Design a protein with these regions (language model features):
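A short LG(V/I)-centered, amphipathic sequence patch enriched
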Residues: 41-60, 77
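Beta-alpha-beta core module
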Residues: 149-155, 160, 218-268
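Flexible hinge/capping segments at coil-to-helix
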Residues: 154-162, 166-188
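Short helix-boundary/capping micro-motifs
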Residues: 11-29
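Secondary-structure junction motif
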Residues: 104-106, 185-208, 272-273
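Alpha-helical linker/hinge and terminal dimerization helices associated
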Residues: 7, 43-44, 65-94
Length: 285
């Protein structure tokens, strides 16, 4: 059987065109690479190389062999990746969260339901979550849209709306509701990791200056000791967890209210059924 490394050498030589450059990339000597190419030629039993003084080239068959080698190496890499992903899935559940509130609510639940498993989570925009479920980067995801493809199994798990938290002296504090355009141009406190909300803020309030904070404690301290507006979530407001001395005004744009969905591959819905049974459309409220 042909050594995979010899196929890598053939592919690299075909890409480089010279022994010296290929040897440098492969971190080997030219004589060693020449011997290896000769062994490969002997293995397949056909002439792959043209030889002249101080030059080694590829025959048409050699060029075709190099193309096949590249394909085989790609398949080998895919094989290794899939095996590693599968092995990791036996011990680790990777989940993508599209916003902070679902992560806060579901993480303790997931740890309870899948006790003994390692939980690995990301919190970012969900525009590629379905792709990451397909390629098994994630086993679970929480999105702010419901997938329509039968490839995915999903369930609504709640709702969140955004408010703007203002000091009593802010002119907007006298309004029963506001729109994003009312906030455009203001200086606003904002957490750094807020998933898909981040893109929405940038697009809908392009003239606002955001004072980005890494930690919730920093937001709380600044909200307590400054007059900067700060976004608040209906989830925390409904639980009485508000910024002291501030008035929470609802932001009524459609973009500021969303439903959340727990998603997995349909082929794995039985595996994650215990979690899906634990959640409902009021889990996040």
């Amino acid at each position: 059987m042909i050594d995979i490394y010899m196929l890598q050498q053939l592919k690299t030589f075909a890409e480089c065109g010279t022994l010296s450059e290929a040897a440098e990339i492969l971190n080997t000597s030219q004589p060693s690479l020449t011997r290896s190419m000769k062994r490969l030629e002997n293995e397949v039993g056909v002439t792959l190389f043209t030889r002249s003084k101080n030059h080694l080239g590829l025959t048409p068959t050699g060029k075709m062999a190099a193309e096949y080698a590249a394909q085989l190496l790609s398949v080998t890499q895919d094989f290794e990746s899939r095996v590693r992903v599968y092995d990791r899935s036996l011990h680790t559940i990777s989940i993508g969260f599209c916003a902070p509130v679902p992560q806060t609510v579901l993480t303790p639940m997931i740890n309870t339901v899948f006790e003994g498993m390692t939980i690995s989570s990301d919190m970012t925009d969900d525009n590629d979550f379905l792709l990451k479920l397909r390629n098994h980067t994630y086993q679970l995801a929480v999105t702010h849209f419901q997938p329509e493809e039968p490839t995915f199994h999903s369930k609504k798990i709640g709702h969140e709306s955004l408010f703007i938290s203002l000091t009593p002296g802010n002119p907007l504090a006298f309004y029963p509701e506001v729109h994003l355009q009312d906030l455009d141009g203001l200086t606003i406190l904002l957490l750094s990791r807020i998933g898909f909300w981040s893109k929405m803020h940038r697009e809908k309030t392009p003239n606002s200056k955001y004072l980005i904070q890494l930690e919730t404690d920093s937001i709380l301290e600044l909200a307590t000791n400054s007059e900067y507006p700060v976004f608040s979530s209906s989830y925390y407001i409904d639980r009485g967890e508000t910024f002291p001395g501030r008035i929470n005004i609802p932001i009524v744009d459609d973009e500021c209210s969303t439903d959340f969905y727990l998603v997995c591959l349909s082929s794995e819905k039985e595996k994650y059924a215990p979690l899906f049974r634990r959640v409902n459309e009021n889990t996040i409220r």
